Amino acid sequence: MNTKKLFIWLLYLIAPLVSIAQESTQYPTDYLSPAFHAGRRAAFREKLSANGVGIFFASQVRVRNNDVDYQYAQSKNFYYFTGLEESDAMLLLFKQPVTILNKTGTEFIFVKNRDPQKELWTGKILGVEGVKARYKMENVFTNDQFTASTIDFTTIDSVFSAYRNEGIFSKYKRVEDPLSHMANIVDSIINTQNKPIAARSTQMILSSLRGIKQPEEIALIAKAAAISCEGHNDVMRAIKPGMAEYQAQAIMEYHFKTNGSEYPGYPSINGAAENSCVLHYITNLKTINDGEMLLSDCAAEYHGYSADVTRTVPANGKFTEAQKIIYELVLKAQDAGFAACVPGAPFGNPDAAARKVVYEGLMQLGIAANEAEARKYFPHGTSHHLGLDVHDMGPRTLLPGVILTVEPGIYIP
């Protein structure tokens, strides 16, 4: 290799490290820390069986049409354990140290090779050295280093993975790509050696970990909530008869993006009149008329964590007497739900408290004759866990660190 070619290759290898250093001043710095992800991996490994292995895959790129992809969204579990937001990657977490490709440890990650042509079109690929530098992971390899002989499964007693149905890795077999290739190899080994798949146990472990938020996570959820509230407040100021639902959505999502939110936490719901009674209405096309109410169920996602905020306001800025009565009943129910959020209480307590207020109120108003009839106007639960997923996983007991929503509602067509 001549000197010129060697110099070019050195620049190519050093570039990601220089770029990562520059990002500390040119890009957001409030992502989850490498120490956070390392701590979560250690906590997961602690809960594995004596000789278990956890296997997690990055999300695949999804095609929107022809040669255009959807904006990439990482698997939440993979993100939780690594922070990496690239496709075509696999994480292995072992209870006991093993040796893979002459490296001994309990954590191994396989990632994409750097590719100048792909990077020209879709942006920088971190590669092995970039992942080591950014996420402080030691045992990092390229996908093409993974073969059927890479892992000795003979001593493994259980495989912990969140995937099953038609073979737990079937979702990765649709397209021939590096991720599918690795998944097929792992699946073949597991089937050949009859290793049990602890899918249910995996979900229970993930729920116990992800359900109790760490301080870094709470800060990101609070940021997502603050961004979301800014959007809701501006919609309340801007709404007027003649505005379209999609204009309310545009105002909302403008605030999300201008405050650094990567995505909405879920498709924005902005429904007026009859559309406000469709729980997951996302068409957002109707013109909002005088006297109608607009329900906005919209929230930002910030660095992987979602908020969840719903507000209902009159288009003309003034509640009718009937609208005010129902609004205040829902507010009273929400306050009852908040009061029931006590550490150690069953997860269902806020729902029971809010539902009692709604049912009694609707019967007193003569809208419902009994609880069964009242339920038609309050058809969903009051609370769910909130975090990496807007409907997140978590324990069935209200423990310190649990974040949940309290969102009763009354829907009268």
Functional labels for PLM-detected ranges:
Residues M1-E23:
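Bacterial Sec-dependent N-terminal signal peptides
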